[in-house]
Every structure is written in structure tokens, then in C-alpha cells.
Amino acid sequence: MPIANPAATAPYATRAEETRGRLFQEPESATRTAFQRDRDRIIHSGAFRRLKYKTQVFVYHEGDNYRTRLSHSLEVSQIARSVARVFGLDEDLSETLALAHDLGHTPFGHAGETALDSCMRDFGGFDHNAQTLRIVTKLEHRYARFDGLNLTWETLEGLVKHNGPVVTPGRSIADLPRAIAEYAETQDLELATYAGPEAQVAALADDIAYNNHDIDDGLRAGLFDIEDLMALPLVGDVFQRVMDRYPGLETTRVIHEAVRELIGTMIEDLLSETRSRLAEARPRSAADVRAMSRPLVGFTAEMTEHNAALKAFLFERMYRHYRVNRSMSKAQRIVRDLFSLLHGEPDQLAPEWQAGCDGPGGIKTARRVCDFIAGMTDKFAIEEHARLFDLHDPRA
């Protein structure tokens, strides 16, 4: 029988000892809960290790101090565990989902995803959440008896639904990314309901970490300065308070103090709003949380507006900055070049990636090439492009 997590004390917490199990049955551990085993499998996966060299905005060689997908995932997991602990949830499940949520991202961040989705337009498209599901259910080859990591139902559910129900009145299973729709035929993840509370915590921890650490990275890179932030609601107020509190403080310390305070403020808002929703809904189980008409975990309306203003600022001043655009344009060209060549000439793939292809230009070949490129790090994609296209590259 699965063992329990004694720290998950809330009646609405997901119970490790009551897990719906794994697709392939395995003996239970005598020392770890089901969700602790999921977390450990994620950490030991090849896809997780590669996050070290996958970036969100800046290509890997632009500086050692910018965040990678790996450092971001660790920051998300820290916030998620802290919030889950406050509410008596299963911290291990929240941590697992935080660590795994970016596994499906391409090299070069959203620019790489846009390029790969365009390449796959006639072959089912590309979606990073669906790719995460493919990785943990098919593409990791570490076990003798099954492909993937054989994670629990609760972890898979959280990975697919952390942003809310994916089947809605206006969206059927047929409209979903192919990987999710196909997996739904194998295992029912209850796609029309919300995810459990631990997944909801991980999703908002991602929002908190992403936005605030992009402020840090954008300021470090000189894409905007503190003065540009002063007109933003909440953000400008926090920076002003820090500068008033510590007159003459060096800029780097001002940034660290302000970002830390912003993260704390957003967490406090999340805690307050979620307590209010708990008092209203009074869920008695994780199933009650899934059946709610809105998320249990959330921000106040005011904080949601502040977040939207910050995202709009970052989109305009950071993600569309000409320096970022130049870098991302090059990155997209690399992805398109790699896909075009390898899809048309799959014999250029390593033998293990040729397996499952159906010839030049084939549908199965497209998905194999897509999986290959999506799993690349920024560094490997650049080097592979040079090997395939640069006649003077000694590695060709």
C-alpha cells in the first residue's frame, strides 16, 4: 500500500496514500511516497538535466547570470513548496509539478516553440505542454518495462491541467494538441475539471517567479531601467519604497531588494485570496477542489490587474526589444533549417532517431524530427546547425 505524507494535513489535500496509481503497476516504496518517487524520477531524467542549457529569453552564451529553464524551475519549486506548506497540501506533489512544468520547452524559448509549431503545422502542430506529456509518457527511455517515467495519475493530471480545464464547452478533445488527445484514449485525466490544489499552486508559483525574475534579467541586460518601471502599478511603488528605505543603495542591491519584496507581496496576496476562497467553498477533498467552478488558488482581482500590466510591459520592452528580436530571429532560423533538412533527409539523423520514421517528408518522420529538435539545448541546436550547414565546421 502507498505510504502517506504526514505533512499533507488539509482535508482537501491530495493524498499520496490514495493515489490513483500508475499506468504500469509497480511495487510501492517502503520509504518514499508516490509523489516523492515522481519527483525523483523527474530530477533523474535526461530532459530535466537539459534544462540547464535551455533559456527563456537570452540564448545560452549571452551570459552566465541570466536564468535558464533549470534555474527557473528550481525557483518555481521553492515558491510552490512554501505555499503548499501553508495550506497543508502535499508539498512533494507541488514540487514535482514545478520541476516538470518546463520539460517540453524547445531550445530558444518561445521563439523556438513558435518556429517548431510552424514547421509542424501540417503534422499536428507543436505545444510545449503536450510535449511535456510525451516526454514523461514516451520519450524518456530509462526503464525496462515501459517507456516514459510511469508517473502517477495525479502528476500527469497536474501537468496537463495546471492552467485549468482543457476540455470546455467551446473546446472538445478533438481540438486538443495531438499528444494530449491521444493520451486521453489511454488514461482518463478528467480533462473537463480543474486540477488538484497542488497543481494550482505550482501554476501560480510559475507566474510569480517568471514575471519577477524577468524584471531582474531585463534590468541586468539593460533592456530597460528602474525609471521605466516606476509607472507600473505595484512594481513602481515597491521600487520607490526600497529606494526611500535605503537612500544611496547601489542599483544591484535595489533590484534584489525590490524583486524579493515583489515576490513576497504576490505570495501574500495569493495566500489571502485563497483563504477567502477556502472559506467560501469549504472543500472536503481534492475531488471537491477539482469540481469547483473556478480555481481554488488564485490572486485578487487587483493583483491580477497588476500582473497583466507587468506582463504587457515585459512583452513590449523586453520580449520585443530589438536585441532580443535579433537573437530570436537567428534562433528561429536555426530551428526551421534543422527541421527542413532532417524532415527531408531523415538519414541524417542518428540511428536511434531514424527508428520510427516513415521516409522523407513523412508524418511519422515529422514527429520524430520534432521530438529530436524539441529536446535540444540551445548549445546543441547551434552546434548541430553548424555541423549540418557549415562546410568548414570540423565536426561536420
Swiss-Prot record:
Keywords: Hydrolase. Residues 69-211 form the HD domain. One of its GO terms (biological process) is dGTP catabolic process. Pfam families: HD, HD_assoc. InterPro entries: dGTPase, dGTPase-like, dNTPase_2, HD/PDEase_dom, HD_domain, PHydrolase_assoc_dom. SUPFAM superfamilies: HD-domain/PDEase-like (SSF109604). GO terms for molecular function: dGTPase activity. SMART domains: HDc. Transmembrane segments: none annotated. The keyword Zinc does not apply. Belongs to the dGTPase family. Type 2 subfamily. This is Deoxyguanosinetriphosphate triphosphohydrolase-like protein. It comes from Parvibaculum lavamentivorans (strain DS-1 / DSM 13023 / NCIMB 13966).
